[in-house]
Amino acid sequence: MMNWNTLISAKRFGLEEFHQERHENRSEFQRDYDRLVFSAPFRRLQNKTQVFPLPGSIFVHNRLTHSLEVSCVGRSLGTDVAKAILARQPELQNSYLPEIGSIVSAACLAHDLGNPPFGHSGERAISTFFSEGKGMALKEQLPAAQWEDLTHFEGNANAFRLLTHQFEGRRKGGFVLTYSTLASIVKYPFSSSLAGKKSKFGFFTTEEESFRRIAEELGMKRLNDDPLKYARHPLVYLVEAADDICYQMMDIEDAHKLKILTTGETQDLLLSYFPEERKAHMLKTLDFVSDVNEQIAYPVSYTHLRAHETLMNLV
């Protein structure tokens, strides 16, 4: 059984021996968020597409704007989940549990950092380079587990490496984020040998011990030793939910901006999420809005709320 008292830790990866609580204007988890925002890998997301190619004069979402929006939704979900847990377990009020919103927000900001250009197509291109292309020349020089990592390249595992690996000339611990933020981005807490047909896994062989250290410190449930596999950190589900809410809504909004969908088709898609009474109220409000983009932005924001309400009813 996992325990909230251990699952949320402000200990920083790579700075464990210097761990201390600072009583300043930001919590440790807000520091994680700020550290990511000001980083070069985060800025690089602006040139990575979300779904549609970057068309220039029409501003559709890219990975950077998507990550910012996911972090906002994640913060709201995390804050509400923390309130729900505290209502049932008030003894956790003086723990780090009220910080869940900040942790999820930071993890959401980092969730796409390891994705190559062109998303899943980019992952397949890298994998194919090693499994069928010139990269095959390296096969005999690598252990089987590392070769498996390369022939099933995974953006999520690459994000964990980017955040924790000590690159040439850089400090120990990578971004030196808190253990809880790092654990919250690992959707697939197992190695590539367990990836299966979907080729999904959470860390490369080179970072396996780093993940083990984090998981053991947080008291995450270990499901298997060799190959290594853990149960997810609970906050991963909130990061994943925020990501799903955003990309499904934003893809529809972008399709409208690019004139792939008409205004009527887009409104029908978005309004289908609502009961008839709420839908009638929204249509009445839309009668007062003449700007076409605003006619879509309004139901998009309400659809976020609808998804949020639905999730919170399950807590």
Task: Report each predicted region and the residues it spans.
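Conserved small/polar residues in nucleotide/adenosyl-binding loops
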Residues: 303-310
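Sequence-structural signature of the catalytic-core scaffold of metal-dependent phosphohydrolases
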Residues: 1-25, 37-48, 57, 68, ...
